[in-house]
Structures are given as C-alpha cells and as structure tokens.
C-alpha cells in the first residue's frame, strides 16, 4: 500500500510539473482569449543565424510574436534583443541557463529567473512580464517565485517539436492543428467544445535558437513559418503577443 501511495504521489507531481495545462504548481496560460488571436512564441534565442531572418518574415506578414530568450544569450546578443523589441515583439523570461527546473530547489529556481530578468532589463530598461519554463517543466515553488518576480507563466496549446532535426515538410505537417482549429472555430469543421477551448485561440511554441549553443540551425522552423503565415492570415487569424492575446 505504501508503494502504491508513493507511486500515486509521484504521478501527481509529474502531472503538475510537466502537463502544460496543469495549474497545480501555479497558473499557466495555454490559450489566447479570442479564437482569432494566434500567439506565436519562440524559445531559446536570440540566435544570430536565424532570428534576424525570422524578424524579416514576421514583418512581411505584420505578425507580432513573443520571444522567450535565454539570459546567457541575451548577454551575448543584446543588440538583437533590442531590435526584436523595437519591431514590436514581446520579450519574456526563459531562465538564465535553461535548466530542468523539475530538479532545481527554490534558491536555484529564484536565481535562474532573477538573472534572466536582469539581463533583459539591462537591454530594454524594463523587466519582462511573461515567463516560460524550459522544456515546460515546473516545480512546486515555481508559481510563487514567478509571481514574486512579476511574471505570468506562458505554456502552449501546440508544441510541434521543431527542436528536432527534421525536414521542414515534417514540421509543416505537425503545425496543421492551428489551421484545423481556426476552421473549426469558423464553423467549417465540428465544434471543439469538448476540448474545453471554445472561443479561445492557440498559443504556438516554436524555437528560434538552441539553448546549448548560439547559431543553432533552425532553418526548418523558418521554412515552416514561410509556408503557414500566409495561410493562417487567409484564415483570418491575427498574430499577437502574449499580452495582446490575453487582454480583453
């Protein structure tokens, strides 16, 4: 019986720390407030090899996005972070070194958020308001610590796995649910009320960098967005930041 209790407790903790929509370890945002608002987000940058091209692509379609850079890369590429914000995109906190927060104690968790906040504030002269945990992994004290730093936790409704080394065509296929959801909401498909997201829009998690190194190859992410942005636009989707997507 004791073993069963331990296993059950471990299962609950795993659910709370890994499942994106779990609110067990603090409130998380996985959807936008309106079905036509698509929040495209990028983790693990800035990336000198890809982020500038990505900014040009987003500009072409008048798309605003949210970037969650790693603090150590913010310090390495401050001008790129500054340019990203100057183009109207939102900058969030993705920790200083991209650890597995599941295995971090309160002090280490607090330091990871603090250092990344400071790195961003040094560049933009203001602290971020949004935070995304690396790998989406959380711990029991993260919610309170994020709140102490004035951070809201952003998760996602779709994460297609663009960190994997796969052809762009594979990633394009993995991003199909965004269009399917838009068509459902427009009445072209069946209602998705059973999914509990009626009237809500998607938060898409992509990666413009590789947390292990600068200049990581994310060409497939760029190509997939080149394919989908005009199609999403034609479906009537509005590309918004996390703050824009959760207001109103």
Residue ranges and their predicted role:
Residues 57, 83, 145, 230-231:
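Alpha-helical scaffold elements within enzyme catalytic domains, especially in hydrolases
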